[in-house]
């Protein structure tokens, strides 16, 4: 991993880190640096695996094209094997979609329907204005308060 860095250079970096960061912060700094290095390694490995997988798929595709051009009768065993692998991969990709299509064709959920605003308003004819009129009585708003004179009370006026 440390190509070109010898033991003496690593020792010098460690001593400088100890002097600059101190004994309390050096372990935390080392842990964070090693965490970054691990994350970069994981990312590089995942990219490498994805590229290898894509190259394998491209190779299978090229083998299939080669087999089509030669004709399927006189193929080498390698090409027959790669054709079988490609067919199996295509079937495994199609299986989840076939299961999903067959289950969704049998039943249609009524909850998934979209209603127009007219349909919704016909089911619930009460408007917010009507409900507020039912909750408050008009007599409560028209009656003056009896027995309390608020004109002489300064706190009630303002």
UniProtKB/Swiss-Prot annotation:
- What's a Pfam family this protein contains? TatA_B_E
Q: Which Gene3D superfamilies match?
A: 1.20.5.3310
Give the UniProt keywords, A-Z.
Answer: Cell inner membrane, Cell membrane, Membrane, Protein transport, Translocation, Transmembrane, Transmembrane helix, Transport
Q: Where is this region: Disordered?
A: 86-158
Cell location? Cell inner membrane
GO biological process terms, semicolon-separated: protein transport by the Tat complex
Phosphoprotein: is it a keyword of this entry? Answer: no
Q: GO terms for CC?
A: TAT protein transport complex
Its placement in the membrane is given as:
Single-pass membrane protein
In Gene Ontology terms, what is one molecular function of this protein?
protein transmembrane transporter activity
Q: Which residues cross the membrane?
A: 2-22
InterPro entries the UniProt entry points to: TatA/B/E, TatB
Which superkingdom does the taxonomy of this entry point to? Answer: Bacteria
Q: Where is the composition biased (Polar residues)?
A: 88-107, 113-136, 143-158
Q: What family does the Swiss-Prot or TrEMBL record give for this protein?
A: Belongs to the TatB family.
Protein task: Part of the twin-arginine translocation (Tat) system that transports large folded proteins containing a characteristic twin-arginine motif in their signal peptide across membranes. Together with TatC, TatB is part of a receptor directly interacting with Tat signal peptides. TatB may form an oligomeric binding site that transiently accommodates folded Tat precursor proteins before their translocation.
Assembly and partners? Answer: The Tat system comprises two distinct complexes: a TatABC complex, containing multiple copies of TatA, TatB and TatC subunits, and a separate TatA complex, containing only TatA subunits. Substrates initially bind to the TatABC complex, which probably triggers association of the separate TatA complex to form the active translocon.
**Can you say what this protein is called?**
Sec-independent protein translocase protein TatB
Q: What organism is recorded for this protein? A: Shewanella sp. (strain W3-18-1)
Upper lineage: Bacteria, Pseudomonadati, Pseudomonadota, Gammaproteobacteria, Alteromonadales
């Amino acid at each position: 991993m440390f190509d070109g860095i010898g033991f003496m250079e690593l020792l010098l970096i460690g001593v400088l880190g100890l002097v600059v960061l101190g004994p309390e912060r050096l372990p935390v700094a080392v842990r964070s640096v090693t965490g970054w290095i691990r994350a970069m390694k994981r990312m590089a490995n995942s990219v490498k695996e994805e590229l290898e997988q894509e190259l394998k798929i491209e190779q299978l595709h090229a083998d299939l094209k080669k087999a089509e051009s030669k004709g399927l009768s006189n193929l080498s065993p390698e090409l027959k094997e790669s054709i079988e692998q490609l067919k199996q991969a295509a079937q495994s990709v199609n299986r989840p979609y076939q299961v999903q299509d067959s289950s969704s064709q049998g039943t249609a959920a009524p909850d998934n329907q979209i209603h127009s605003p007219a349909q919704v308003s016909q089911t619930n004819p009460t408007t917010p204005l009507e409900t507020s009129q039912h909750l408050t009585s008009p007599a409560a708003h028209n009656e003056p308060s009896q027995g309390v004179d608020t004109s002489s009370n300064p706190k009630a006026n303002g």
